[in-house]
Amino acid sequence: QVERNGGIHPESGREKLREVLLSGGDPMVLTNSKLAAWFAALAEAGVESIRVGTKEMAFFPQRFDRTFLEMLDRFHETYPQVGLHMMLHFEHPDEILQKDAEGNYVEDAQGFKQWVPATGEAMRGLAGRGWLTVENQAPIIRGINDDPDALRILQREFKRAGGENHYFFCGRDIVAYKAFNIPIERAWQILNE
């Protein structure tokens, strides 16, 4: 009925759900078959955009292996009208870049910083699919990445690898996070330096 009415529910008058974010925990700990089932169910329900929020590439980049990428390709072949967006969570360039014994980022002959091999391979696997977007979103955390240089390197290297920088945000103002939060004014300053 919703489809027959141009995306408007005939009784409630509301638009259909167009975008879904899979998050809350980490959906990338699910098996490929479970992810495929979720993706297909959402596509069949008429969802136009699926975002997958994950920190898994920082912890276990091998999860983004050939079989996972093949599952994504099959999904896209079946539902090409559905946008798929991988929303990665990297907070600091140390999570993606190699360092030498002195703690400096490793550069190649052209001066480009080198990714940690497994993470770089996973990123290339995702970013190499022109139909899928890869974005980074991260909190600004006191004592971790509240540094303009670190965020600049993170953004530059992520973009150079084929990703986009979605956004940075401040933590929620609750007791458990207070030690890690920075004032929004300071976040604004950092992002504009």
Regions found by a protein language model. Name each.
Residues 186-193:
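C-terminal accessory extensions appended to soluble enzyme cores
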